């Protein structure tokens, strides 16, 4: 994996609040190597470690994208939903930003069936077929389509398991990380001071509660993905 410069600087991370962890009573001892201090009852993340692992993650996704690999971004916090969707669309990644359904990856055959139903319903609606149905039947199908759009809209073009999964909140997306571990899918995860850094292939110590922190980390990753995709397209 080639190392590159991703313009990751401490001042920018401090301004985004990346260094603020949880209260000292809520910490996970496994995060000790990534904590630099305690301040007013709160753990402070070592931003030098954050920069190192974020840079490694950017190198990884750049190399993967330059080879045409696929990515799935998972972040189902309500406040982060729009951020996840816009970042994923910008970098042409799949995403889940509403709810992670258990078995979404490990029961991929079922997920594929749901996606097929979703695509069929979208096609029928676009062709105006709902207009020829009784009102009650049309209303039922529209509700079903709306539900599928809400929960599967971010993966509607996903035809196979992703090559790399990016997780924005380890504790909230624990099931997603478990499924990736079972399937051997490499993962990149933000880890706050109450998380377990051993659960992902690359853990980026960072504040996973503040939108400015999440946005900064995610923007760096999707920029690297976009750069890798551009190289892949040029070399085809």
UniProtKB/Swiss-Prot annotation:
CDD domains: RPS2. It is found in: Plastid, Chloroplast. It comes from the Eukaryota. One of its GO terms (biological process) is translation. Keywords: Chloroplast, Plastid, Ribonucleoprotein, Ribosomal protein. Gene3D superfamilies: Glucose-6-phosphate isomerase like protein, domain 1, Helix hairpin bin. InterPro entries: Ribosomal_uS2, Ribosomal_uS2_bac/mit/plastid, Ribosomal_uS2_CS, Ribosomal_uS2_flav_dom_sf. GO terms for cellular component: chloroplast; mitochondrial small ribosomal subunit. One of its GO terms (molecular function) is structural constituent of ribosome. HAMAP family: Ribosomal_uS2_B. Belongs to the universal ribosomal protein uS2 family. This is Small ribosomal subunit protein uS2c. It comes from Zea mays.
